[in-house]
């Protein structure tokens, strides 16, 4: 099992390119099921999750070709299998995103209940409720969501909570439904907007994406399109937290700063010097960061996917920070590992109190989920001595060659196999 060996204490300097957003790429790949015509997607990140999605689509009969420049061409003109099996779905919760497209275009689907990071229940009941409102007959059989419909019919749907994947699934189902669908309490995330922009290029009629009320007028069919996946705001924020903790001066190319308002505000509050352009961000930290608290919230609030990285920055900051996790339960599993490095953190329910320390010291730590992995890498970059991060397959689910990019910024970080760490 691969690990990362990090020798901390070196500031980060230079520039790297931000990859396409995982959380946009996954639903966009699944949208290929909505048409028999080719879909050409640029800026698709090379991640375990995108590879799993492509394997899942391939199992269904979707033909996919990946070019060296990050372009993926998909064509779903020979789909002959409408099932997403547990063996693929168990590793990635986003596999549920094939449910809406399959149901809308083919009238049936059989999708295993999902897995993914162990950071809370994240139930799919809102997906099921919404699809049922569109006229689908849905049952849970032997661990599978089994759905059938002759043709979906437009409806007004209000989800009980803001759900990103739920909004995306219902959006993809609604574009081929008969009549108008109104999604109330819809997710406003940039990744939802990116999916909607692709669907519009494919011939969908969508209004209101980026707000909490999306209106979809269904069409009979969609056609092929060309689309570039939006930049990953979480990857960009992770690298900025890294320079905040380790010090230095970095520039991120291919970024989307207009999607990162809440994160950039927190980093400025922490003492980073931030400069932005249309597609770049420069972040510099000279001296010790200031402790900064945060409450996670749906977009445009502070993202839950940035909570662990900000906490890693706070572990070496001057002062005390209070972080409140409002989105998911069980998302403080990185805390005990940060404490192994010398962090001073107390947890009380959804609240974490982080007292900054003058220095962290390297140790062996274990990643527990995707963003927790990133927080341990950040802490390792700031720590004195050597840190070994185990179970980095979590990291590979959502970061495109993180150690390669960090080395380009001057970090001492190497991927090693289990044998090499003995």
Swiss-Prot record:
Keyword Mitochondrion among UniProt keywords: no
GO annotations of cellular component type: cytoplasm
Pathway: Cell wall biogenesis; peptidoglycan biosynthesis
Matches recorded under InterPro entries: Enolpyruvate_Tfrase_dom (IPR001986), Enolpyruvate_Tfrase_sf (IPR036968), MurA_subfamily (IPR050068), RNA3'P_cycl/enolpyr_Trfase_a/b (IPR013792), UDP_GlcNAc_COvinyl_MurA (IPR005750)
EC numbers on record: 2.5.1.7
UniProt: UDP-N-acetyl-alpha-D-glucosamine binding residues: 93, 122-126, 305, 327
Modified sites of kind 2-(S-cysteinyl)pyruvic acid O-phosphothioketal: 117
NCBIfam families in alphabetical order: murA (TIGR01072), PRK09369.1 (NF006873)
Family: Belongs to the EPSP synthase family. MurA subfamily.
Function, as annotated: Cell wall formation. Adds enolpyruvyl to UDP-N-acetylglucosamine.
Name listed for the protein in its UniProt record: UDP-N-acetylglucosamine 1-carboxyvinyltransferase
UniProt organism field: Bordetella pertussis (strain Tohama I / ATCC BAA-589 / NCTC 13251)
Lineage summary: Bacteria, Pseudomonadati, Pseudomonadota, Betaproteobacteria, Burkholderiales
